[in-house]
Amino acid sequence: MFRLDGKMALVTGASGGIGAAIARALHAQGATVALSGTRREALEALAAELGERAHACPADLKDPAAPDALVAEVDKIAPLDILVNNAGFTRDMLALRMKDEDWQAVLDVDLTAPFRLARASLRGMLKRRAGRIISISSIVGATGNPGQANYAAAKAGMVGMSKALAQEVASRGVTVNVVAPGFIATPMTDALNEAQKAKLQEGIPLGRMGQPGDIAAAVVYLASNEAAWVTGATLHVNGGMAMI
């Protein structure tokens, strides 16, 4: 089950922890993976680690032309079957102090770029009557978080966008879904002391922070044939932190 042999996948934000884990998991299931992000050296290192069926495809999604160019580059490797919109960043500030450019910068990368990538990917997917679009949102898109009005808006918008797209393309065999991570362990959280980690984990019923592999497993499922009857869904992977 969950094999992806012969499939072509594009993972954005592949140089980060979650993105790299997703790329590794898709590759392990047999997919060819295009690794995109802004850090060329990290992408090339991951491609070298994975070896055959892995390609570094750097792109800066702040550039409005980048999504179309990236999908065209991937299509030259093989027709794109699986798009994983994982790239994103935060620029936190309380709303009263948030500058317009900080609001817009987050929406440009975290919401507008995923839309542009989906639009570019759908051209081929609809012709082939098959495809998977999977976007990585956040628990913050459902619950909100102080100081993250821009990020919360982008991640909530990603869910609404995905539901609309899912309805538009379902008749052509293309599914559109979302994975919403909760609190995931990162190098930043690794630097916390045990007391600080314990406090963070108090709000997680399963008693631990998530790992990038937890998110990657959800993506593999949604990318697989076994998820062919799942579309317009948001899979919350948060240890029970928010039971939505």
Question: Over which residues does each language-model region extend?
Answer:
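Residue(s) in the substrate-gating loop at a strand-loop-helix junction
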Residues: 138
